[in-house]
Regions:
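Short beta-strand elements of ligand-binding domains
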Residues: 164-170
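Catalytic-core regions built around general acid/base machinery
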Residues: 1, 146-161
Length: 170
């Protein structure tokens, strides 16, 4: 009965812990529905996100992007010279060449789309354009301590928006 009402039911203690954690983290966010936006810098991850939105205890769907969202994401990709490599859709593989700013701007575009109720963002810390690793003499100033890194800017973006954002770091 509760599943039919939209509740997620934990099948075991580990699942309960995960659901309890998510409930605590997302308690201030308003979830309007089950339409997901999925962004990743790796193709396998975006496919995995799409394949994992239906389970025994819940079902979501990939939200259809509004034309304005598609245009905005295309602009971002053009500015990053990734437009020839990336097709705008949901889920979207924004390519390992996408930098922190691209991750943030595309997340924001998805958050503003009325057909998206929640966003999942995958970040690959080993991608060459992302500031997500410890400081290194090989890339001075281009690490997670940089104030322009996703580590510092994503929490601000999440705080400004009512929709939930889930981050995945591979």
């Amino acid at each position: 009965v509760v599943r039919h009402a939209g509740a997620m039911v934990a099948e075991d203690l580990n699942s309960f812990d995960d659901l309890f954690y998510l409930a605590g983290v997302l308690h201030a966010k308003k979830i309007e529905g089950g339409r997901l936006g999925a962004i990743s810098g790796a193709g396998f991850e975006s496919v995995g996100m799409a394949d994992s939105i239906v389970a025994d205890t819940f079902a979501m769907e990939m939200g259809a992007l509004e034309p304005q969202t598609v245009e905005r994401v295309e602009e971002i990709l053009r500015s990053k010279r990734l437009d020839a490599l990336v097709e705008v859709r949901n889920p979207i593989d924004i390519n390992p060449g996408a930098d922190d700013e691209a991750h943030l701007q595309i997340t924001e575009a998805f958050l503003h789309d009325p057909n998206i109720d929640a966003v999942v963002v995958g970040l690959d810390p080993t991608a060459p354009s992302v500031r997500a690793l410890e400081a290194s003499s090989l890339r001075p100033g281009f690490d997670l301590t940089d104030p322009q890194s996703t580590v510092h800017l994503m929490p601000l973006l999440v705080a400004r928006n009512a929709k939930p954002v889930i981050g995945v770091v591979d």
